[in-house]
Amino acid sequence: IFGFFQSIEDSDSQLFQDLTIRDTDIDYDIVYVNWDNGTDYIQRNAYVLEEVIKWVNERKAVAGSTEPNVVLGQSMGGLVARYALKDMENDTDLNHDTSLYISHDAPHQGAHIPLGILHMGRHIVNEFIQTPLGNINIPINGTGSYGLSTIDDILDAPAVNQMLINNVDTNGNRT
């Protein structure tokens, strides 16, 4: 959560800072959800979000609040939030009590990574894993180093496979 607050402070947005980290007259409760496994199936993370929304609604009822929820989903979180809200709408026993859903930069029509990049990633992993060098680290744009198995794990993650329009398996076959 420290990283979340730090990113708010670094945002240079006075309004955003007032809403989230400063004591002002603006009266909002912000519930920030960070997934233990963000690359798990979108549906599974949506079910977790449904539980969070139910918890929030229970707390609001105890406090006597009638304010509806505002749900913001960023990137893949937009897909998770959309799925959770629609799933709750489809269940007549559940009420998400949400007046506004904001989707920011979410790949609602799928994500596209050029096939050449996917093939290259798989090829590099396969070439180096099959050599006596073992698992080496590859620097990625100043963000540190990632092991080759990390590249494989990311490309094989359930959510990545759900979002990608085209994908390449470990043998280089399109899926």
Question: Residue locations for each model-derived region?
Answer:
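Active-site loop/turn elements of alpha/beta-hydrolase fold enzymes
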Residues: 28, 33-37, 106
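Short, surface-exposed "cap/lid" segments of acyl-processing enzymes
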Residues: 1-27, 32
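Serine-dependent carboxylesterase/thioesterase catalytic core
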Residues: 46-175
